[in-house]
Each structure stands twice: as C-alpha cells, then as structure tokens.
Design a protein with these regions (language model features):
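Charge-dense, helix-prone N-terminal extensions
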Residues: 1-120
Length: 120
C-alpha cells in the first residue's frame, strides 16, 4: 500500500483541526506517529492520540508503515458503515464521549455499530 497524503502534526489539536475540516472530504491520510519515545527532532503525535482523534470523527486506524527515516506512518480512513468494531474501540468511544471529545460524525459511526451489535 502506497503512502499518499502524509501529514505531519506537532500536537493533537492540529490533527483534530485537520479532521474537523476534512473528515467528510478525504478518503484517507497517513499521520506521522510513534509508539514509544519520540526523538525531539521528530515532533509527532503519540499513536493512542491519533487513534482517539480518528474515532472522534468516525475514522479508523489501519496499516502502520515505517518511513525511510525510521519514523512511523499510521493510515487513517473513514470507517465503513458495516465494519467490525473491537470492544477496545467501543470502550474508547464511550470514554471520548464522557470527555466531551466525540463529534457528531463519530457518534453516528459509533451508534451505527452499536445498533448492528444489538441486532445480531
């Protein structure tokens, strides 16, 4: 899978602003991230914050790739209506809602998944 639309954010609020402006327009993006300690010369957002912000807008993380310079790129895309939700992501959505971070787009994606689970 080719890395297209690679985005660099210094902090979570920059990613959130991008998602606010693009969650209903873009088909995907790749976000520079890290899973352990990030060197100071590579400002990036921690993986968990990338995942949480994606969920807030009804998006999901998928493929993780290492960039040539050693950094990581996480692919994000809008969640498909009938996609499977892990219990971990459902718990995260409830926590994000409690913290006042969920958007209407994120709520709709989450409620759609809850409806499917209850129907099965």
């Amino acid at each position: 899978m080719e890395i297209v639309n690679l985005l660099h954010f210094k902090n979570r609020s920059e990613l959130r602003q991008w998602l606010e402006e693009n969650h209903d327009k873009e088909k995907c993006c790749w976000v520079v991230t890290y899973r352990s300690k990030c060197p100071p010369e590579w400002p990036a957002i921690p993986y968990i914050e990338v995942v949480e912000e994606a969920l807030c807008f009804g998006w999901i993380d998928s493929t993780l790739k290492r960039l040539p310079d050693g950094r990581l790129a996480q692919r994000l895309s809008p969640r498909r209506p009938k996609s499977h939700w892990t219990q971990l992501n459902m718990d995260r959505c409830e926590d994000l809602e409690d913290r006042g971070l969920m958007t209407e787009a994120g709520r709709q994606a989450f409620e759609s998944s809850c409806k499917q689970v209850s129907e099965n």
